[in-house]
């Protein structure tokens, strides 16, 4: 049973999948940082200093000035957070699109290469004749 599990776990596809998941997690963190630390501040500057992380509609309770305080007071719609996550998604989707496009292009190049021509029957027969002739002389 342990041997079967080891064969299953160490198959190429399983290891590739595990590596992909780990790299994907790291890539997600990188995209979050790019969006939160670079893109959103630039968008905030362009839009007159709007802080998207603190944009919300408070549905209940006394009006609050921060999203955290509004969430403690009651239900809120955090649309600024949604905008940030939407930008995250679009960046990840775009990068994945580019990766898949590149892989498809490389795959087409690989398929386009013609297979080496097989030697003709005459060439093979000539080689066999030469080998037999050498064996008879020896």
Curated annotation (Swiss-Prot):
Keyword entries, A-Z: Cell inner membrane, Cell membrane, Ion channel, Ion transport, Membrane, Transmembrane, Transmembrane helix, Transport
InterPro entries tied to this protein: Mechanosensitive_channel_CS, MS_channel, MSC/AndL, MscL_channel
Annotated localization: Cell inner membrane
Membrane topology: Multi-pass membrane protein
Residue ranges of the TM segments: 15-35, 38-58, 80-100
GO molecular function, one term: mechanosensitive monoatomic ion channel activity
Principal localisation: membrane
GO CC list: plasma membrane
Family, as annotated: Belongs to the MscL family.
Known function: Channel that opens in response to stretch forces in the membrane lipid bilayer. May participate in the regulation of osmotic pressure changes within the cell.
Description of how the protein assembles with itself and partners: Homopentamer.
Protein name: Large-conductance mechanosensitive channel
Gene field: mscL
